[in-house]
Amino acid sequence: MSTRHDRIWVGIDAGKGHHWAVAVDADGETLFSTKVINDEAQVLTLIETAREREEVRWAVDISGRASTLLLALLVAHGQNVVYVPGRTVNRMSGAYKGEGKTDAKDARVIADQARMRRDFAPLDRPPELVTTLRLLTNHRADLIADRVRLINRLRDLLTGICPALERAFDYSAAKGPVVMLTEYQTPAALRRTGVKRLTTWLGRRKVRDADTVAAKAIEAARTQQVVLPGEKRATKLVCDLAHQLLALDERIKDNDREIRETFRTDDRAEIIESMPGMGPVLGAEFVAIVGDLSGYKDAGRLASHAGLAPVPRDSGRRTGNYHRPQRYNRRLRWLFYMSAQTAMMRPGPSRDYYLKKRGEGLLHTQALLSLARRRVDVLWAMLRDKRLFTPAPPVTQTA
């Protein structure tokens, strides 16, 4: 049986190219401090060195892609690993001697925190489905960010060619105007083409409401006769950006299709999608973040992770002062907020609850957040009981 001194804690300051590992014993004495290249052979050597003691507990400050190899090897060798948030490391570093910041010091802080605290979340190797959904949803977020950048650049260039044409359409929501910009970018070109020919040209490219798009474009073109400086070069850039935007939309569609197909291989997909406002994309985001829900004891813990459970800020006689937490998963909060907003727009219990909160004097955003918190409880109960969503609670239906 191991004694108190047979147990060690290894803190790892993880990085992309290399990690730094520091081991401490139960008395807080440093046993070793070493640099470890992010390579299988060196990580295995570190594991074997640490396992010379009877019991080893590991702690890392990064749970993302940089530590994937490290975590996979630790889990494969049956090691216990916990996650020490970077915010904790940053705050606790100030309690140590000296103002310097090094990888070795951070690793020592991580090891000490793991030694003194028992409430850090354990890390395990996620299922292949969860890993795949994380990759796909992260890639989708990158594609959406690229799309926003392209649209902003496109609108900026159009303003320098014809401000009226830039104002005429919502290029982020309609495909037709973007298709038009692949061929016609200037007021003069649009006026020469005319409404009839432009409608025919758009119709051949299967643009929805081609006549409306053509009429609005020609109307905007007729408001400007002057040629602005740099128009010749700007038109080429607009044409190029329009082609890029159309190609990017196809990539997003392909990615969404893959997300949908992958998500629906999960046994919980049907349950999650049965809840109003939770489509395949938001459902995939949910599974990618929470995994199998084993890290949450109850719905309150899940709501806390999503930043939907207020935390107290009491002092002395000042009590009942609640505010939004600072540490929570932004994407998880976003998906519950968006699903609540979608569900609120349709008749049903979500809209009834939203209107009830509005009647109590809450602002729109406050009522939506309150609804999102309520829906966390509902989704948790659905997954726990493995049942689909029903407008009325099960007890009411039975009665």
From Swiss-Prot:
This is Insertion element IS116 uncharacterized 44.8 kDa protein. PANTHER family: PUTATIVE TRANSPOSASE FOR IS117-RELATED, TRANSPOSASE FOR INSERTION SEQUENCE ELEMENT IS1111A. Keywords: Transposable element. GO terms for biological process: DNA transposition. InterPro entries: Transp_IS110-like_N (IPR002525), Transpos_IS110 (IPR047650), Transposase_20 (IPR003346). The lineage of its organism: Bacteria, Bacillati, Actinomycetota, Actinomycetes, Kitasatosporales. One of its GO terms (molecular function) is DNA binding. Belongs to the transposase IS1111A/IS1328/IS1533 family. The keyword Methyltransferase does not apply.
